[in-house]
Curated annotation (Swiss-Prot):
Species for this entry: Halorhodospira halophila (strain DSM 244 / SL1)
Record NCBIfam families: tRNA (guanosine(46)-N7)-methyltransferase TrmB
EC number per UniProt: 2.1.1.33
Protein name per UniProt: tRNA (guanine-N(7)-)-methyltransferase
Keyword Transferase in annotation: yes
Reported function: Catalyzes the formation of N(7)-methylguanine at position 46 (m7G46) in tRNA.
Active site: 132
Enzyme class: transferase
Pfam families assigned to the protein according to its UniProt record, in alphabetical order: Methyltransf_4 (PF02390)
Entry superkingdom: Bacteria
Family in the record: Belongs to the class I-like SAM-binding methyltransferase superfamily. TrmB family.
C-alpha cells in the first residue's frame, strides 16, 4: 500500500548561488554536510565523533545565527536543516571561518528527517526560528507547527528537552501558542500562554531583521517536554 502524500511545510526558493556559495557546497560538504540515508536513522555519535547534547535547528536561513550559537556553545552539537541552497552555502562558509567542529548541515525536508532518520530520544533542544507563516487560511495545514509534528518531537526530545519557537507573524504566534497549550506533554517555561520576555536568548536572524523593518513584533515561545510524558 502506498504511503499518503506528505504535506509540504516549505517552498524551495532556489535563488542565485554566488561563486563562493557554490564552492562551499562542493568543497565544504564533506566536512559539514549530512548525506541522509534513504532508510534508517543517523548515527549522531558517529556523525559528530562524540556523545554530547544535541540541538536541531530547523530552517536556519543564511546560517549566521546558527553558526554564532554553535561557536558560543562548543559543549553541544548542532544539526541544522535548510533546503535553500544559497543559505546552506553561506552557512558552510561561516562555519569554516568560525572553525566549527560541532555543526552539521542537512538539506532535506525537516519533518521527514525527524520522522524517519533521527533516533529518539536524542535531542536536547529543537529550535524553529521564523518558519514560513503560510498566512492564507487555506494554507494553514502547511504550517510546520501541527499536533502531528509535536507527536514526532515528543518522541525525539529527551525528557525535559526544549522546543524554542520564534515568529514575527502575530497570527502564527497565536497558532503556535494554541497548539502547544493544548498539548499536555509540553510545559510553557514562562507560564501558561506566555511569550518569552525580550530580548530572547538567541541571536537575531536575517528574517527577524526583515520583519522588524516591516514593523512586525517578534514573539518567542519556549516549551519543555514534561519528563513523565517523554516519548
Amino acid at each position: 500500500m502506498s504511503q499518503p502524500r506528505q504535506t509540504r511545510t516549505f517552498v524551495r526558493r532556489e535563488g542565485r548561488l554566488t561563486q563562493g556559495q557554490q564552492r562551499a557546497l562542493e568543497g565544504l560538504w564533506p566536512q559539514f554536510g549530512v548525506d541522509v540515508p534513504e532508510r534508517g536513522v543517523i548515527d549522531l555519535d558517529g556523525l559528530f565523533g562524540r556523545a554530547a547534547p544535541r540541538v536541531l535547528d530547523i530552517g536556519f536561513g543564511d546560517g549566521e545565527a546558527l553558526v554564532e550559537m554553535a561557536a558560543a556553545d562548543p559543549e553541544r552539537d548542532y544539526l541544522g536543516v535548510e533546503v535553500h541552497r544559497p543559505g546552506v552555502g553561506h552557512c558552510l562558509l561561516c562555519a569554516e571561518q568560525a572553525g566549527l567542529d560541532n555543526l552539521r548541515v542537512a538539506t532535506v525536508d525537516a519533518v521527514e528527517l525527524v520522522r524517519h532518520h533521527l533516533p529518539g530520544p536524542s535531542l536536547e533542544t529543537v529550535q524553529i526560528f521564523f518558519p514560513d507563516p503560510w498566512p492564507k487560511k487555506r494554507h494553514h495545514k502547511r504550517r510546520i507547527i501541527q499536533p502531528a509534528f509535536l507527536d514526532l518531537l515528543a518522541e525525539r526530545l529527551v525528557p525535559g528537552g526544549a522546543l524554542h519557537l520564534a515568529t514575527d507573524w502575530a497570527d502564527y504566534a497565536e497558532w503556535m501558542l494554541d497548539t502547544l497549550e493544548a498539548d499536555a506533554r509540553f510545559e510553557n517555561t514562562c507560564g501558561p500562554r506566555a511569550f518569552v520576555p525580550p530580548p530572547p536568548p538567541r541571536p537575531q536572524t536575517k528574517f527577524e531583521r526583515r520583519g522588524l523593518r516591516k514593523g512586525h513584533q517578534v514573539h518567542d515561545l519556549i516549551y519543555r517536554l514534561r519528563p513523565d510524558t517523554a516519548g
